[in-house]
UniProtKB/Swiss-Prot annotation:
Residues 75-136 are annotated as: Homeobox-like. This is Ceramide synthase 5. It is a multi-pass membrane protein. Residues 333-414 are cytoplasmic. Its EC number is 2.3.1.291, 2.3.1.24. Residues 139-340 form the TLC domain. Disruption phenotype: Mice are viable and show no apparent morphological alterations in normal conditions. Decreased palmitoyl (C16:0) ceramide pools. One of its GO terms (cellular component) is endoplasmic reticulum membrane. It is found in: Endoplasmic reticulum membrane. The gene is Cers5.
Amino acid sequence: MATAAAETLGLLWGWLWSESFWLPQNVSWADLEGPGDGYGYPRAQHVLSVFPLAVCIFSVRMLFERFIAKPCALRVGIKDSPVNKVEPNDTLEKVFVSVTKYPDEKRLKGLSKQLDWSVRKIQCWFRHRRNQDKPPTLTKFCESMWRFTYYLCIFCYGIRFLWSMPWFWDTRQCWYNYPYQPLSRELYYYYITQLAFYWSLMFSQFIDVKRKDFLMMFIHHMIGIMLTTFSYVNNMVRVGALIFCLHDFADPLLEAAKMANYARRERLCTTLFVIFGAAFIVSRLAIFPLWILNTTLFESWEIIGPYPSWWLFNALLLILQVLHAIWSYLIVQTASKALSRGKVSKDDRSDVESSSEEEDETTHKNNLSGSSSSNGANCMNGYMGGSHLAEEQGTCKATGNLHFRASPHLHSCD
């Protein structure tokens, strides 16, 4: 039994790392064991260093949010208010959990008779109960400030060292002498740090503000991590670094817009969101296909020719480009409403979500009048990174996470 299991695992491992699938013709994994120059060639063992680094990044994040982001939030006027617990009531709790969080008028009257409470009191109970589950604005601001800081720093680092790389200016050099392209120190740090950050996102999902797209984002992060790992082991790190940098370009603007929203700076929020939309569309609908897809599809075909994993990576990049087009359409819709109304309105991509300090009176009234209201629309994710900006009570509301990074990197959408 043990021998059969070992043989099965051996076959599975051999299939997973099949040279005929992952590498060009006449290239073997043994060929990439040589030292090369600098940090040598990418190896699977290098990926192991990602896990302690991910823990370090996660720890730095906790310290950053506690000692830097929180004081900044308080300074811009965000309150550190405790969540007020609603009066316990088993009957209403059962309805809230199992039936609806937004009872209609008929149900309210029935509960009123059953509990001998006024309809108004029951309305207030449900409103406070909803707010009890919603994250404080302070928490969301701190999360966005951390992501803003990381995205800005990693983008600056990436563009600084890529600027001096010949393959940044001539993408054909991503494929000359492939896969015998040794790692530089800067490229090694850049790739491993990015991969570690995505692993830290996996950890933090379980303590971050819970979104309706939790499962989707979990799967999205897993796929992004797998693709980024494979691209590293496969030594597609040059073009992978270009994709990283391009996807990092717009993310700081989104997080900045969300912070402005949480701080109730509506005009600044709208301005930043419109700038973000322009940056996203230019980078994803113009630069990505003309710069990235051109080199991965045509230049690589001419220089090294196709092989099985080449088709896989390009298929994923084409799917990513389709998502870019969909996301851009939704961003244009939201930006158009922002410009016409003077503020960011409901983002069709995102969950509508208020903090525990805010009350959703408009949604509540719509329910009582029989209109349908939703606590969210489909979220927008991507990359390889996601973003959710919404309007509640006529104010600029930023919610969710825009991780266009899922496979930026060959991701995830904060």
